Amino acid sequence: MKDDFAEEEEVQSFGYKRFGIQEGTQCTKCKNNWALKFSIILLYILCALLTITVAILGYKVVEKMDNVTGGMETSRQTYDDKLTAVESDLKKLGDQTGKKAISTNSELSTFRSDILDLRQQLREITEKTSKNKDTLEKLQASGDALVDRQSQLKETLENNSFLITTVNKTLQAYNGYVTNLQQDTSVLQGNLQNQMYSHNVVIMNLNNLNLTQVQQRNLITNLQRSVDDTSQAIQRIKNDFQNLQQVFLQAKKDTDWLKEKVQSLQTLAANNSALAKANNDTLEDMNSQLNSFTGQMENITTISQANEQNLKDLQDLHKDAENRTAIKFNQLEERFQLFETDIVNIISNISYTAHHLRTLTSNLNEVRTTCTDTLTKHTDDLTSLNNTLANIRLDSVSLRMQQDLMRSRLDTEVANLSVIMEEMKLVDSKHGQLIKNFTILQGPPGPRGPRGDRGSQGPPGPTGNKGQKGEKGEPGPPGPAGERGPIGPAGPPGERGGKGSKGSQGPKGSRGSPGKPGPQGSSGDPGPPGPPGKEGLPGPQGPPGFQGLQGTVGEPGVPGPRGLPGLPGVPGMPGPKGPPGPPGPSGAVVPLALQNEPTPAPEDNGCPPHWKNFTDKCYYFSVEKEIFEDAKLFCEDKSSHLVFINTREEQQWIKKQMVGRESHWIGLTDSERENEWKWLDGTSPDYKNWKAGQPDNWGHGHGPGEDCAGLIYAGQWNDFQCEDVNNFICEKDRETVLSSAL
């Protein structure tokens, strides 16, 4: 507006000066009349032009104002429509955002509660997993212990199976011995019948001699007395032989009874064979004496005095035989009692081991079931946890997507609102300018007035209403962890928890003391025959069978090389007694058992026959089985000792030389002091090859523990009871062998 007024002033001033209109002093002095007239005319013309231009300008201004007012009304209507639409959109957006905010708040609250529940569940799961780790470690330890026990049980079962096979072999051998004894008893019965017949013949001869020898009454009376004595002796012999038959029958019954229970009867078989040989010897002596008696009775007329002496000798021999048989039968009864006690102990051991194995199998089954149950529970829990975690991840992903969508929508809406607000501000500014221009153009601009004084400050306007509460913003990032506060006071004791889960089974207690052996029960009735079992595994190689029948004589073959000298044979039956020879000089009688065997020539390797050479030592691997002390004595009789294993090479060589699954004694024992194993020469072993878990000094619940060492079939060392029966290995230096051979 100021610029317009300045332009009008400049135009007016320019026009006045141009037409020569100056101050009044100059006009009054210099102007002429024509000039005044001409100037007045020009003034009228100018006034007319000015009125025309003002009318034209007013008309144009009115047209422009009409156009402006129409545009303003249309713009107002459009802006009012837009504002109503924006208000409706804002209301809709407010409602939607409120609903969405409520739904998101509810969803966030539920999500937070779910997350808290999941955290609680995860804590419980971690606690359970920690507990389960402890239980699993315990189960693993118990499983390792069970594996060790199973290995020990397998070894004991293998040893028991090996013992059972050896018992079966001994039973088979004992059956053969029993058949031989039965044959011997039948032969003895035949011999007794022959002797009875010969005794009857002798009695008849004596009666005939009594009838014929009437003249020699004194001699006959003495002979009759002697004959009566002999008849009484013969009757006693008959009674003794009948008792022997009964004893043999009882022994047969006892052997049948022992077949079902005995496990190791080799010593009994050897004793029975020795007893049978002794009985054969006594019977042979009796046969020889009876033959001599018959010869003497034929020559009784000439040598009656010799007959009386022979009868006295017979009585003495008979008494000695009776005493010997009584002593031997007492020894047999004592041995039978010992065998019965051994059988009872063996049966109790077998029952104890069977019960122990049953308990172990039941414990193993329980542990397996508990392990499988816990593993299935853990797998189910883990699968459910995996499923819940997968669901949580899916829900969190979907919630994040929804939050991203909501944020993008809010951003777009806020951007739209900001654009609309800026447009509204621009429209308001344009409207204000138009209104100002409209008020200014309504009248002609007047002259510029003087500058007025500054007005007083108006009173402050009323305070506006309080706005609505804004929406809750998003939670900010978590702040840094504060310092740890002081320890609070101890809380009150909590409630007593529920009953915990059942703990793992404790370790097995120590072995109890063995009970007293119960009385022997009566033999039960034989049960019905069971169904035929499955075909078993091939058993170990059995003992050599009995000698078969003699075959047909074949053609003589090519003579082979001369063999080694054989063992001395069984002494044959004594021949008939010859006539008495002249008395010879008295000499020392050497028994057969103490006679030295012929020493065989040593082999080329410097060791005797049946001995094997390794480095500078000779080794003897026995075929027979003995207890530890007997094996020691056997090796000492061979001028050797039980083997001392000092190197790994020697151990490997001995392992290769061992045949089958038999155990062998070695010269190692802790009989002097427990758990101090020493060789028989008193030295401690430098090299050791004990089996895992050995020596354990297991006493089997009877008597002392295991104090003697031996080699098992795997070549490892194990401790045994010194009363066990095993093979053995003897050892001696090759130099001593060579010197003795020279």
Curated annotation (Swiss-Prot):
Transmembrane segments: 38-58
Protein name: Collectin-12
Binding site for Ca(2+) 2: D670, E674, N697, E706, D707
C-type lectin domain: residues covered: 614-731
GO BP terms: carbohydrate mediated signaling; cellular response to exogenous dsRNA; defense response; defense response to bacterium; innate immune response; phagocytosis, recognition; plasma membrane raft organization; toll-like receptor 3 signaling pathway
Comp. bias regions, Low complexity: 502-525, 534-556
Molecular function GO labels: galactose binding; low-density lipoprotein particle binding; metal ion binding; pattern recognition receptor activity; scavenger receptor activity
Binding site for Ca(2+) 1: F644, N646, E650, E731
Tissue-wise expression: Expressed in perivascular macrophages. Expressed in plaques-surrounding reactive astrocytes and in perivascular astrocytes associated with cerebral amyloid angiopathy (CAA) in the temporal cortex of Alzheimer patient (at protein level). Strongly expressed in placenta. Moderately expressed in heart, skeletal muscle, small intestine and lung. Weakly expressed in brain, colon, thymus and kidney. Expressed in nurse-like cells. Expressed in reactive astrocytes and vascular/perivascular cells in the brain of Alzheimer patient.
Residues reported to bind a carbohydrate: K691, Q694, D696, E706, N718, D719
UniProt membrane topology term: Single-pass type II membrane protein
One cellular component term from this protein's GO annotations in UniProt: membrane
Membrane side Extracellular: residue ranges: 59-742
